[in-house]
Amino acid sequence: MLATTTPTIEGKRITKYYGIVTGETIIGANLFRDFFASIRDIVGGRSGSYEEVLRQAKDTALREMQDQAALLGANAVVGVDLDYETVGDSGSMLMVTASGTAVRIED
């Protein structure tokens, strides 16, 4: 399923709007705390393992959003937005939310 941050898809006509769809995922407390601890340990470098966890969280949120759109009969999602927020009592978890508008585009 096509998902794009733009409000339209060049060369395609939107034939039906189904409404807003979302997908969410949360990275657990220990992982999130360890993520920030690793940042302190890295000077001028990148932590590939934590980047991979964040990438997986983003991909999960996008997949859930697309699955919700498919259940409505959509074949694309436009206006996609990704948000990252800390949640929990001490802000020890990270929530990734994907949202957009489910649409049907001409084939």
Swiss-Prot record:
SUPFAM superfamilies tied to this protein: YbjQ-like
Gene3D superfamilies for this protein: Hypothetical protein apc22750. Chain B (3.30.110.70)
Position of the signal peptide: none
Domain of life: Bacteria
Entry's transmembrane regions: none
InterPro entries listed in its UniProt record: UPF0145_dom_sf, UPF0145_YbjQ-like
UniProt-listed HAMAP family: UPF0145
Family from the record: Belongs to the UPF0145 family.
Record's protein name: UPF0145 protein BVU_2335
Phylogenetic classification of the source organism: Bacteria, Pseudomonadati, Bacteroidota, Bacteroidia, Bacteroidales
